[in-house]
Curated annotation (Swiss-Prot):
This is ATP synthase subunit c. InterPro entries: ATP_synth_csu_bac/chlpt, ATP_synth_F0_csu, ATP_synth_F0_csu_DDCD_BS, ATP_synth_F0_csu_sf, ATPase_proteolipid_c-like_dom, F/V-ATP_Csub_sf. The chain crosses the membrane at residues 5-25, 50-70. PROSITE patterns: ATPASE_C. Keywords: ATP synthesis, Cell membrane, CF(0), Hydrogen ion transport, Ion transport, Lipid-binding, Membrane, Transmembrane, Transmembrane helix, Transport. F(1)F(0) ATP synthase produces ATP from ADP in the presence of a proton or sodium gradient. F-type ATPases consist of two structural domains, F(1) containing the extramembraneous catalytic core and F(0) containing the membrane proton channel, linked together by a central stalk and a peripheral stalk. During catalysis, ATP synthesis in the catalytic domain of F(1) is coupled via a rotary mechanism of the central stalk subunits to proton translocation. Belongs to the ATPase C chain family. It comes from Lactobacillus johnsonii (strain CNCM I-12250 / La1 / NCC 533). It is a multi-pass membrane protein. NCBIfam families: ATP_synt_c (TIGR01260), PRK06876.1 (NF005363).
Amino acid sequence: MKYLAAAIAAGLAALAASYGNGKVISKTIEGMARQPESANNLRATMFIGVGLIEAVPILAIVIGFLILFL
């Protein structure tokens, strides 16, 4: 049962993070198309946002390992 819980935690976190990354990147590209002069600022902000979004599945994988081994 704990194997299933770890798989669900990691799978749902990865699914949510990929959806979030897609939304962030698509809105950034849309903003760059509208205002090309602010592309550098948008790109930097996008990388910060993507990094914060990617922290969630990493934490979910750590929690999954804790479920498995503790």
